[in-house]
């Protein structure tokens, strides 16, 4: 006979709420003082929970930050996917999706600056997660370009290669970093034409 679960719907809801509050607190604390200077005491105080609750969800502050990074990256990727218009030429799809992406980032300038900068300070694990997220974005670009109705008669698998898709994401990422350094996150949508051109230029020349 199967033993009854000790996790009720109420318990699950409470755990979800605590995790959400901890992630929000991590965002605020890391934005104000950086991950290196942040302490678990800072995070739980901001979240209004105990240290015990923190350790029920995360091993350390770095794990908490990486969870925040993954969560916000997934939200940004969802914005990109929702902006795709499959019946339009891929060039139009890319431009529309990137404009929505930049608008999404510009809506939270403090968080964007924290995530894009602080991830570089988390050593090999931070690098691994960053590459994981960049690969997901590259897959999106690859699918959008190669799945679009206008590929110039070139076999879809040859319009944009995985390597060039990753290069496009890397280039766009650097444009965002530059905007952060200049304090121009609120103007990110102005990068849409340039970022779209990066993707177009990295497709095969005979697919133009």
Regions found by a protein language model. Give the residues of each.
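N-terminal intrinsically disordered/low-complexity leader segments
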Residues: 1-17, 152-156, 207-208
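Hydrophobic alpha-helical connector segments
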Residues: 67, 81-110, 157
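Amphipathic alpha-helical segments used for helix-helix packing
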Residues: 106-125, 142-145, 177
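Helix-turn-helix
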Residues: 21, 29-63
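Amphipathic alpha-helical packing segments from all-alpha helical-bundle domains
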Residues: 74, 124-150, 158-174, 189, ...
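Generic hydrophobic, amphipathic alpha-helix propensity
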Residues: 15-26, 43, 68-76
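C-terminal peripheral helix-coil segments that are non-catalytic and often amphipathic
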Residues: 1-7, 103, 107, 139, ...
